[in-house]
Amino acid sequence: MKKMILIAGPCVIESKDLIFKVAEQLKNFNENPNIEFYFKSSFDKANRTSINSFRGPGLEEGLKILQSVKDEFGMKILTDIHESNQANPVSEVADVLQIPAFLCRQTDLLVAAAKTKAKINIKKGQFLNPSDIKYSVKKVLQTRGIEDEGYEAAQRNGVFVAERGASFGYGNLVVDMRSLVIMREFAPVIFDATHSVQMPGAAGGSSGGKSEFVEPLARAAAAVGIDGFFFETHINPCEALCDGPNMLNLTRLKNCVNTLLEIQNIIKENK
C-alpha cells in the first residue's frame, strides 16, 4: 500500500531544546509503516510581516540543529530556502527543499533547487491559478533533464506541490478543493492544512489564523484523494514565536493523522 506523506514540525527553529521535544513526540510517525515522514522546521522565516518578528537562528546554526534531529531520531528533513545560494548547503542536510509560496515562480530558485539531489516541495502561491503550478514543476523537471511531464514524471523525480489556500480578499484565505484535483495532474499533492487557515497580517504586524478549521479541511482533502499532508505543530502553540494561531498542538495532530489514515484507506478500498 502506498504510504501517506506526512510533513510536520514547528514553523521555525526557536531552540534546539524545543525542536528535540517536538521530534520526540513525532517519532511514532517516523516509525509508522504507513507513513513517509519528514520533520519540518525553518532556519529563517524571511517573509515575516514585521521587521521586528522572530526569524530563526539562521542558516549555519539552523542546519546544525536539523542535522542533529536527523542523527538523533533518524528522521528525514524538509526545510525551505529563499535564495538560490542556499540550495547546495541546505541540500547537504535536508532531504526535501521547500520552495515558499511567495517564491513559487522564481526561476533561479527553482533551477538551483533542481540542480541538487534533494526532493522538492513547491508550495502553490496564494495568488496562483492551480493549473499554473505545472510551469513551476516543468522548470524543475527540465533542469533535471526530464522532458516528460505529469504526475508520474514528477513522482519519479521527487517533485511535490502543496496547496496552502488562495487569497480571498484582504487578510483571508480559502481552500478550493478543486485545486487538489487540478494540481494532481502535474505532481503528487500535499495539503498544507495549517497555513490554509492562516489570516495574513490579521494580527497587527503578524499573521493570525483559525486553527479550529485545520482538522475539517484536512479531512476534506483526504476525501478528495491526495498524497500527503503538511502540519505545523508545537508543544504550546499559544507561545510559538511564529504562526501559533494556525498550528495544532501535538495531541490534536496525532488524533488528526489517525483519522486521515482511516479516510485514505476508505478511499483506496473504494477506487
Swiss-Prot record:
Question: Which Gene3D superfamilies does this chain map to?
Answer: Aldolase class I
| Keyword S-adenosyl-L-methionine in annotation | no
- This protein's major location comes to cytoplasm
Q: Name one GO cellular component term.
A: cytoplasm
**How would you classify this enzyme at the top EC level?**
transferase
User: What EC number(s) does this enzyme carry?
Assistant: 2.5.1.55
User: Where in the cell?
Assistant: Cytoplasm
Q: Which UniProt keywords apply?
A: Cytoplasm, Lipopolysaccharide biosynthesis, Transferase
State the SUPFAM superfamilies in the record.
Aldolase (SSF51569)
- Catalytic activity annotation: D-arabinose 5-phosphate + phosphoenolpyruvate + H2O = 3-deoxy-alpha-D-manno-2-octulosonate-8-phosphate + phosphate
Pathway assigned to this chain's UniProt record: Carbohydrate biosynthesis; 3-deoxy-D-manno-octulosonate biosynthesis; 3-deoxy-D-manno-octulosonate from D-ribulose 5-phosphate: step 2/3; Bacterial outer membrane biogenesis; lipopolysaccharide biosynthesis
This entry's Gene Ontology molecular function terms read:
3-deoxy-8-phosphooctulonate synthase activity
Source superkingdom: Bacteria
What Pfam families is this protein classified in? DAHP_synth_1
Q: Name one GO biological process term.
A: keto-3-deoxy-D-manno-octulosonic acid biosynthetic process
InterPro entries annotated for this entry?
Aldolase_TIM, DAHP1/KDSA, KDO8P_synthase
NCBIfam families from the UniProt entry: KDO8P_synth, PRK05198.1
As for family, the record states:
Belongs to the KdsA family.
What is the recorded name of this protein?
A: 2-dehydro-3-deoxyphosphooctonate aldolase
From which source organism is this entry?
Campylobacter jejuni subsp. jejuni serotype O:2 (strain ATCC 700819 / NCTC 11168)
